[in-house]
């Protein structure tokens, strides 16, 4: 059944947004809409839809901020292991390349992935998000690594096809800890907790590798890293 029918009525929707003074709009591209099987043939109708949508945004004076992945992994890829499988990285790289190349003239602001922990740790460790699995720490850590590789491939695609002025970054849901008091001990404890909760992702991106503290903590459950992974 139809709901808001944005697929057919986006131009009306954007007119309403413009009338409210909205000048920026964050949206997500649906991976399965462009590649229904995840790594098969590109669906030209899907790409054409997003071109129409983005052109409409520009007509209404609204700047798009485009997210490449917001949790809608193609089911065919999930059935082959999902984020636990290295093949998902290869499929995402192709998706990112085709999407950025096909839409670069209409987009200047790109977001690679939305909230990595939600589709890795919560999805494959805690099990309260799709696909609802409860795997070992080693498997969860490998999903982190695969997500980081996808971030790297998306950044590379934007650098290759985005053109002058293109920007790209990650949306991450960091955990924040505030010290109870401003004593040196509490401040140090808050910093240590922040590092414990965040550096396996943010540290890996900014330091081009996993921190020694993280590797020592996880031990044998550390993700498998192949040569060149952190060269993206």
Give the location of each predicted region.
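N-terminal structural segment of carbohydrate-active enzymes
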Residues: 1-43, 47, 53-56, 60
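Active-site region of glycoside hydrolase catalytic domains
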Residues: 37-38, 48-232
